[in-house]
């Protein structure tokens, strides 16, 4: 084994920490994975223990190296990809979190977002950040932590506090507190980042009463930003690539030219389309975001995306398993759903944590409609599976309209992309081929690619992208009229779910 033969990618997700060792062909050589606990202290609240995440991430990194038969000396670089928006504050001197991290799914700041909109800040925030004002993003979560964690605001004003999303937290831990940084893909999900200036917005920080000093510096997505302490993985490894999970997956799917798009089917479901070197203002409440930034001479060059996010995709299947007991394992849903020819007009709207793009209704709730005495668990399973494809099709229609670029195919990844029935549903509802890659680990591969480019492991985007290959293509089978009728029925079901948990007047 020769030195610098591999790249290690850390993939810090919503429900588990993973690590994967890749070779130059983009082949997985070793892997590790650990789930960690989800905390639900109140309805609508979701939290993670950042210390547990760090320990689980360190364990799986060591496991991946063991499984690859590799050591730190065999690694050219380390890349990081992460669940986005999840918000943490910690003490600079000790690295001790002041509270559990507030997860992207958490809705506790919905009322704060409503006040921002009521006070007339919505348009400015959307124009500056590319985001819709929503509790999903980090900005209001950080403001909440500063106002509700005892002593946090005074510590922040004294310069004793650090804020970060999960990438920043892992870099801090890996470098022993030497590096406090993020990349533009993660920064652009905070609602604190000016897409056009490519920097934190002082106006937004003032609006939310957030001291600039607690924010990390912003480094390119592909750049050497520090080195791991030798005690963590047996040697110093350059940390050279960082991107939020959905942007990393888009990079790993080699969506390098405008009009290329991917959908990742995980806990949530996220579709991103490359729109080139300038942000696109959405007319359909989609998000405009940074895909990645690469060094270009003495400057950096950002690639922009439009994104639609579904809060509940695989999580809806988990609810069938854990909440209703309809299936014993998530993988069982495909056979159960395939045991009936259709849903018999049953629709599931999995708005358990509100609705994301293009509706953005934090008060929507999960809805199951169209049931009769003839409805079986198979119909409910099929409706749940179809809801994932329906939400994605709705988003793609908006993306096409915003970008003016028709899609010729959709590249897919994530755990649920292994479900052949779901992928065929997706092709039928989109009317374009759905393509699953040979290497399913697109998110981790994207982080590896960004790190590898920074250290010369791959010489160019073209060299990295050349390894992408299709494993299977799902061709659409439905005519346009059938497709549109199904989408229209879905829109009816979505309307029924909206506003369900909105507080009554005087009871907020």
UniProtKB/Swiss-Prot annotation:
Membrane-spanning residues: none
Residues given in the record as sn-glycerol 3-phosphate binding sites: 14, 84-85, 136, 245
Catalytic reactions of this protein: glycerol + ATP = sn-glycerol 3-phosphate + ADP + H(+)
Binding positions for ADP per the UniProt entry: 14, 18, 267, 314, 419
UniProt-recorded Gene Ontology molecular function terms: ATP binding; glycerol kinase activity
GO annotation (BP), single: glycerol metabolic process
Keywords for the protein's UniProt record, in alphabetical order: ATP-binding, Glycerol metabolism, Kinase, Nucleotide-binding, Transferase
Sites where the protein binds glycerol: 84-85, 136, 245-246
Protein's job: Key enzyme in the regulation of glycerol uptake and metabolism. Catalyzes the phosphorylation of glycerol to yield sn-glycerol 3-phosphate.
Protein name per its UniProtKB record: Glycerol kinase
Organism: Bordetella pertussis (strain Tohama I / ATCC BAA-589 / NCTC 13251)
Organismal lineage: Bacteria, Pseudomonadati, Pseudomonadota, Betaproteobacteria, Burkholderiales
